[in-house]
């Protein structure tokens, strides 16, 4: 179980005296998650039971968290299905628990859909577009901290662990992305707050009694940052719309996502021209981070890192797939 800081129900009940959420009825650790300790929290107030998620942050510090939490609050207030942070009586949404930053957010309905079909992808695409539009007037600013500058900084640290073919691929792709990021076309791409990590396990789908499903929402915004919207879409397609064994794009799923996104926020000609570049950028970002996690684990790492070859394979596919990429 990925609960690294333990806390008892009695401890939580005392901590929650500063909130107006009612009485604690249950506290259960959540097995998923790598970066934080997460718990399902059941509260009862005026005879009504409500579900929340308590997160204790294991790596991020107090000064690193306001962008993410206030973005979630902003999006929730604009009708986007994301966890809404709950304020304490003093209005603060971030407080200390066991010497670490902690927050309580609303629990989204549903479960992750790990074998998505085109209709799932369409719902994700439409909500991603709505999220991008809703975030346009978010006042806080923070760049995507895992973008080009981080790739450039990290590459010299990981190249000693790579074979000659991998070093060549990484060096050439960094050069390609450096040129792309410095171009006028890149500067012209629209952007704003992005999730930057919208994999299929960071969204939930709810199913009704008739078997119909609906998107319950997006969560885990702790890699979010200001970036190009096309990058966020590329990251999402590179996970939701591929064959996991080969990295090949499933055209039906990808076009369902792209068309649903486009129906909400029309994609532009310059975005079409650089779709391959962004799919490559999305693959590179996660290849670099997985290489870094795999070969240079931090002392506090507590779980097995992901296999980096998955995104190496996806990057090679995106470079070779120029004539067979999905679009609207």
From Swiss-Prot:
Alphabetized GO MF terms: ATP binding; homoserine kinase activity
Q: Which UniProt keywords apply?
A: Amino-acid biosynthesis, ATP-binding, Kinase, Nucleotide-binding, Threonine biosynthesis, Transferase
Q: What is its EC number?
A: 2.7.1.39
Is the keyword Mitochondrion in the record?
no
What GO biological process terms does the UniProt entry carry, in alphabetical order? threonine biosynthetic process
Q: Which reactions appear under catalytic activity for this entry? A: L-homoserine + ATP = O-phospho-L-homoserine + ADP + H(+)
Q: What does the record give as its pathway? A: Amino-acid biosynthesis; L-threonine biosynthesis; L-threonine from L-aspartate: step 4/5
Which InterPro entries does its entry note?
Answer: Aminoglycoside_PTrfase (IPR002575), Homoserine_kinase_II (IPR005280), Kinase-like_dom_sf (IPR011009), Pseudomonas-type_ThrB (IPR050249)
Taxonomic superkingdom = Bacteria
Query: Pfam families recorded for this chain?
Result: APH
- PANTHER family attached here? AMINOGLYCOSIDE PHOSPHOTRANSFERASE DOMAIN-CONTAINING PROTEIN, AMINOGLYCOSIDE PHOSPHOTRANSFERASE DOMAIN-CONTAINING PROTEIN-RELATED
Give the record's family classification: Belongs to the pseudomonas-type ThrB family.
User: What protein name does the entry list?
Assistant: Homoserine kinase
Which gene is annotated as encoding this protein in its UniProt record?
thrB
């Amino acid at each position: 179980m990925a609960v690294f800081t333990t806390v008892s129900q009695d401890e939580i009940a005392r901590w929650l005296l500063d909130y107006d959420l009612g009485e604690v009825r249950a506290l259960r650790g959540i097995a998923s998650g790598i970066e934080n300790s997460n718990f399902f929290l059941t509260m009862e107030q005026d005879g009504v039971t409500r579900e929340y998620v308590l997160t204790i942050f294991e790596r991020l510090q107090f000064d690193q968290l306001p962008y993410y939490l206030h973005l979630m609050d902003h999006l929730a207030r604009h009708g986007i299905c994301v966890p809404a942070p709950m304020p304490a009586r003093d209005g603060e949404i971030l407080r200390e628990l066991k010497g670490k930053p902690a927050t309580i957010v609303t629990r989204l309905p549903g479960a992750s859909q790990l074998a998505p079909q085109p209709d799932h992808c369409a719902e994700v695409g439409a909500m991603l577009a709505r999220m991008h539009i809703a975030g346009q007037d978010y006042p806080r600013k923070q760049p995507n901290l895992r973008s080009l500058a981080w790739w450039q900084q990290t590459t010299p640290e990981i190249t000693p662990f790579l074979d000659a073919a991998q070093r060549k691929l990484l060096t050439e792709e960094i050069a390609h992305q450096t040129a792309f990021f410095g171009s006028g076309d890149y500067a012209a791409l629209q952007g704003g707050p992005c999730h930057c990590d919208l994999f299929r396990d960071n969204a939930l789908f709810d199913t009704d009694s008739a078997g119909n499903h609906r998107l319950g929402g997006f969560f885990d915004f702790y890699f979010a940052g200001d970036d190009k919207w096309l990058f966020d879409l590329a990251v999402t397609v590179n996970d939701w719309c591929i064959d996991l064994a080969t990295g090949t794009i499933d055209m039906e799923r990808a076009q369902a996502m792209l068309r649903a996104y486009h129906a909400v926020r029309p994609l532009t000609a310059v975005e079409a021209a650089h779709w391959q570049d962004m799919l490559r950028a999305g693959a590179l970002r996660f290849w670099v981070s997985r290489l870094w996690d795999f070969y240079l684990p931090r002392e506090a790492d507590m779980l097995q890192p992901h296999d980096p070859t998955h995104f190496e394979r996806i990057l090679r596919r995106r470079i070779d797939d120029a004539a067979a990429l999905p679009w609207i």
